[in-house]
């Protein structure tokens, strides 16, 4: 029983490096090798946020030492940033960072999207965005809109 309690108390130290460093490192390597820029956005944003968290920790470490729950909060936040089902880093980028930093932005590969098209793409998972971006690059955005309308029409039938 003491072993389980010891693991529970140090859960952040056991899982943290894998969640906060190893998986993002692996995913960043994959993102660099992929032809699309959408996953680059997720991982570059993650590393920026992780760096800011680290700078924050180094700046106020004396205060954080008095907060026993800080490592667990950091772990949960980083899990939200990293896990593909949440894509928290991409969410933070699209909802906060992007509003203040616009440097000739386009969502991906050189195709300029309207704000409405960007919103539609941001609602999708990273893999779905990649697929739609590839489809748009091949066939154009009009074909995506036709496919969406056809799917809506089909769902109304059933």
UniProtKB/Swiss-Prot annotation:
For the keyword Transmembrane helix, the answer is: yes
Q: Give a GO cellular-component term.
A: membrane
The record describes its membrane topology as: Multi-pass membrane protein
The record, for InterPro entries, names: TB2_DP1_HVA22
Is Lipid metabolism among this UniProt entry's keywords? no
Question: Which controlled-vocabulary keywords does the entry list?
Answer: Membrane, Transmembrane, Transmembrane helix
Q: Which superkingdom heads the taxonomic lineage of this protein's source?
A: Eukaryota
Locate the transmembrane regions by residue number.
2-22, 41-61, 63-83
- Where does the protein principally reside? membrane
| Record's subcellular location | Membrane
Name the protein family.
Answer: Belongs to the DP1 family.
Q: What protein name does the entry list? A: HVA22-like protein f
Species source reads Arabidopsis thaliana (Mouse-ear cress)
Lineage of the source organism?
A: Eukaryota, Viridiplantae, Streptophyta, Embryophyta, Tracheophyta
């Amino acid at each position: 029983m003491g072993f389980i309690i010891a693991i529970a108390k140090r859960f952040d130290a056991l899982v943290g490096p894998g969640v906060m460093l190893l998986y993002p490192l692996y995913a960043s390597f994959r993102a660099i090798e992929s032809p699309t820029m959408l996953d680059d956005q997720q991982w570059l944003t993650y590393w920026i946020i992780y760096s800011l968290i680290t700078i924050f920790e180094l700046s106020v470490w004396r205060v954080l030492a008095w907060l026993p729950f800080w490592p667990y909060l950091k772990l949960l936040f980083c899990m939200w940033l990293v896990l593909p089902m949440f894509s928290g880093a991409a969410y933070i980028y699209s909802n906060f960072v992007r509003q203040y930093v616009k440097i000739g932005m386009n969502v991906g590969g050189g195709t300029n999207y309207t704000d409405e098209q960007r919103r539609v793409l941001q609602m999708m998972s990273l893999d779905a965005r990649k697929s739609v971006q590839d489809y748009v690059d091949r066939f154009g955005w009009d074909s995506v809109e036709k496919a969406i309308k056809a799917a809506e029409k089909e769902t109304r039938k059933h």
